[in-house]
């Protein structure tokens, strides 16, 4: 390559003295690596840009999928269950609308239909008494013949695997009020309940048919 440069320099500038040709040659030689280096950097930069855009386009669908994925929790779902409390009672709604707990696992009033009415919001209805589980603004549990706002309960799965059911419409001093049965199977007032209270924890048990 250097032979070619010397030959062409000599033919292109025959009128220049030898020393000038030498200086010209040195100039060309010194500038050539810089040009190659700049060209190499441009190529590397271009490859990096292409790789970056390629990587971005490749990872985009998966990352988008994580955000787009739907978590419509049991919306429109209907389940038949018995709600077994952490205090060892089955929640019942009797034929007169009274809410209580029983140790009898075969009690017909403990058979409940749990229906999702909104995302994370359910209605609980006793099949044999035809009453809905309801909580009024004072935190009292009662059975309602008609579905109303008192019957909307927020269902949440807790860390221990049990569920909690809080009034969707009513709070007490900014705090949630929960469905709960005390150690004697009696319903607790919503004002005295907290999400961490085990008396408000229920295990939905599948009904064997």
Curated annotation (Swiss-Prot):
Gene Ontology biological process terms in this record: actin cytoskeleton organization; angiogenesis; animal organ formation; animal organ morphogenesis; blood vessel morphogenesis; blood vessel remodeling; branch elongation involved in salivary gland morphogenesis; branching involved in salivary gland morphogenesis
UniProt main location, coarse: secreted
A GO molecular-function descriptor: chemoattractant activity
Keyword Oxidoreductase: no
Any single GO CC term annotated in Swiss-Prot or TrEMBL for this entry: plasma membrane
Keywords: Glycoprotein, Growth factor, Secreted, Signal
Signal peptide bounds: 1-36
Subcellular location(s) per record: Secreted
InterPro entries documented for this protein: Fibroblast_GF_fam, IL1/FGF
Positions glycosylated per UniProt: 50, 197
Tissue distribution: Expressed abundantly in embryos and the lung, and at much lower levels in brain and heart.
PANTHER family linked: FIBROBLAST GROWTH FACTOR (PTHR11486)
Role according to the record: Plays an important role in the regulation of embryonic development, cell proliferation and cell differentiation. Required for normal branching morphogenesis. May play a role in wound healing.
Family stated for the protein in its record: Belongs to the heparin-binding growth factors family.
Assembly and oligomerization: Interacts with FGFR1 and FGFR2. Interacts with FGFBP1.
Protein name as catalogued: Fibroblast growth factor 10
Lineage of origin: Eukaryota, Metazoa, Chordata, Craniata, Vertebrata
